[in-house]
From Swiss-Prot:
The gene is rihC. The keyword 4Fe-4S does not apply. GO terms for molecular function: purine nucleosidase activity; uridine nucleosidase activity. This is Non-specific ribonucleoside hydrolase RihC. Gene3D superfamilies: Ribonucleoside hydrolase-like. InterPro entries: I/U_nuclsd_hydro_CS, Inosine/uridine_hydrolase_dom, IUNH, Nucleosid_hydro_RihC_nonspecif, Ribo_hydro-like. Belongs to the IUNH family. RihC subfamily. Hydrolyzes both purine and pyrimidine ribonucleosides with a broad-substrate specificity. The keyword Hydrolase applies. PANTHER family: INOSINE-URIDINE PREFERRING NUCLEOSIDE HYDROLASE (PTHR12304), NON-SPECIFIC RIBONUCLEOSIDE HYDROLASE RIHC (PTHR12304:SF15).
Amino acid sequence: MRLPIFLDTDPGIDDAVAIAAAIFAPELDLQLMTTVAGNVSVEKTTRNALQLLHFWNVDIPLAQGAAVPLVRAPRDAASVHGESGMAGYDFVEHNRQPLGIPAFLAIRDALMRAPEPVTLVAIGPLTNIALLLSQCPECKPYIRRLVIMGGSAGRGNCTPNAEFNIAADPEAAACVFRSGIEIVMCGLDVTNQAILTPDYLATLPELNRTGKMLHALFSHYRSGSMQSGLRMHDLCAIAWLVRPELFTLKPCFVAVETQGEFTSGTTVVDIDGCLGKPANVQVALDLDVKGFQQWVAEVLALAL
């Protein structure tokens, strides 16, 4: 039985790898994609997502989502992904268009139509998910769980303590973590370990057309290097769905700092239970790196 999932994303080069895995992993049934502003503007993330769907010739509905965070000015990660978000490969022109409704409403409608609760996967800022939970609370029983790439129990990657997806919209993340839905958090504690080695990266052009495309994108990706290895942050959320045994999780109380001058966007992960609050998030703290790398090689070999 394939696991039905909806994927909220902000492509983004490592998003492209995660999308490939979500499409081609035989255990998963990707039924809906939504985009959000994050790595680049939502217009660019939508264009990039549609280009990928056309590249793989798959008919998965896609809805464009939030262009700005809930309350603050947008920030991006163009320094990591390039100005377009997916520079390095010349995609074929197409005439695909997103659905005519906002992402959070598309998620709501699809949840309400689904015969069973659906797993949501969010690998960008959590703006769309916060809008869904705040504007459509009736949807909560139809969400099996939310798996996110975001946060950290330790250091950050865009400030000393904050990870980009959370820092891009801290108020949205705070809303989601307070919501009461089941959450699995794949943060920097594991994603910084999720490295594709130079030896493997060198094999991609001969793997298949997806390998050629990803290799071209990776030459513009700044989360590591082709010589030292590349971190596959977003792919961890997909990997957990398929191979949860590769991850060490701990239930923790997690809150998001929204006020601090230097700490805004920090995920406060109470690993030792100091606050005495009930756990609201399953936090991934360690990764079987060899197992992860083997799984990536297996799933990308299935891509077209």
